[in-house]
Amino acid sequence: MSGTVMQIVRVAILADSRLTEMALPAELPLREILPAVQRLVVPSAQNGDGGQADSGAAVQLSLAPVGGQPFSLDASLDTVGVVDGDLLVLQPVPAGPAAPGIVEDIADAAMIFSTSRLKPWGIAHIQRGALAAVIAVALLATGLTVTYRVATGVLAGLLAVAGIAVASALAGLLITIRSPRSGIALSIAALVPIGAALALAVPGKFGPAQVLLGAAGVAAWSLIALMIPSAERERVVAFFTAAAVVGASVALAAGAQLLWQLPLLSIGCGLIVAALLVTIQAAQLSALWARFPLPVIPAPGDPTPSAPPLRLLEDLPRRVRVSDAHQSGFIAAAVLLSVLGSVAIAVRPEALSVVGWYLVAATAAAATLRARVWDSAACKAWLLAQPYLVAGVLLVFYTATGRYVAAFGAVLVLAVLMLAWVVVALNPGIASPESYSLPLRRLLGLVAAGLDVSLIPVMAYLVGLFAWVLNR
């Protein structure tokens, strides 16, 4: 029974010109007993004095002998040699790297100073878990209500989805003021119920009208999220930019299908054209959306323009980061649009001509060659991923619809792409532009330009534009 008794030590603690005697556990780390010590020796923190509480949160405190250095927070009073009757001082831990911890065994040291012990479970983990639970429940409830609405056609399903969408949107807007990161996560999750609610709001069988309203809602909410100021806005500018561009493009494609009953091949060509336009204008649009100051070039004889305001110059680094994020979002949207267009063109492989297959392959090759132009790692990654995304989506679709020969062809394409990546990884010089001679660079640029130029005539031929002009 004596082994279960906790050893204590009676000490006097001096803090803020106040001497307090107390009995403390001798075998617990100081990190665990200091919060209680601070509450006892600094009573102002309990009386609502915000200054003491804030300073305690900003400056880490520890016990120390009079005139000595603070003890390590991972050491116990017994380890540092504190005995009954000692006088200790509660003082801040000096800034800089922490002193080596005091341990009695190397195995204890390996465990005490491991990453999991230095970053233990805390309130931040509980908050993240609560946020993840809220998002998961919202998404699962959205899936349930959408399924219920589609299966039964009852109005209650639509009202439930609309309620989830409104609650998610309001939560994202309101929580962003207090916790920007949590609010942004909720804003991203709100895209699903918003799109689902607007799509289900259109009566009738699922078709272009539902896609039009759902995509328009996703684009509108993405633009709203981009306009909301927050401390974490720069982290999600790329995501909402891509969502807005893809949503607007898909909405336009669905509107064209709704008005003119276009074939799926024409819709795919239109999406590829939109992807090309977004890619070409990505740099200009990103600078415009980041609100870069327009250059003022005076004409000969005009007075020299005044210097930009200091506040504008100080804000330029932030605008550069925002512009880079917008650019990554535009490139990601262009890649996703080209993937959607290629899949729409090749969705029926048995009815697709050689020209159609050339368009799919040329679009992928042009995106890969276009990656050499961009310095951003995110832009390069998206452009190089375009062939994989197209082949992967087609593989899943062909397998699901029983087109196993076409699915086997998609697997072969993925295998060839994988071998290409392995070869480049083993020979890094292939991916280094400096290793290419000037004639080879010109040849590569000529091939890329030829692929880009050939896309528009091929798409015009596929949609029947040439035949329409000749048969007028």
Curated annotation (Swiss-Prot):
Q: Key word Transit peptide present in the record?
A: no
Please provide the record's keywords in A-Z order.
Answer: Cell inner membrane, Cell membrane, Membrane, Transmembrane, Transmembrane helix, Transport
Q: Which GO terms describe its cellular component?
A: peptidoglycan-based cell wall; plasma membrane
- Main location class: membrane
**Membrane-spanning residues:** 121-141, 155-175, 183-203, 211-231, 236-256, 258-278, 327-347, 349-369, 381-401, 405-425, 450-470
**Gene3D superfamilies documented for this protein:** Phosphatidylinositol 3-kinase Catalytic Subunit, Chain A, domain 1 (3.10.20.90)
**Inducing or repressing factors:** Repressed by IdeR in the presence of iron and by Zur in the presence of zinc.
Q: Which InterPro entries match?
A: T7SS_EccD, YukD-like
Q: Does the keyword Membrane apply?
A: yes
Q: Where in the cell is it found?
A: Cell inner membrane
How does this protein lie in the membrane?
Multi-pass membrane protein
Pfam families hit by this protein: YukD (PF08817)
The subunit structure is: Part of the ESX-3 / type VII secretion system (T7SS), which is composed of cytosolic and membrane components. The ESX-3 membrane complex is composed of EccB3, EccC3, EccD3 and EccE3.
Q: What does this protein do?
A: Part of the ESX-3 specialized secretion system, which is important for iron and zinc uptake or homeostasis.
Q: According to its UniProt record, which protein family does this protein belong to?
A: Belongs to the EccD/Snm4 family.
Q: What else is known?
A: Was identified as a high-confidence drug target.
Tell me what this protein is called. Answer: ESX-3 secretion system protein EccD3
Record the organism. Mycobacterium tuberculosis (strain ATCC 25618 / H37Rv)
Upper lineage is:
Bacteria, Bacillati, Actinomycetota, Actinomycetes, Mycobacteriales
Gene that codes for this? eccD3
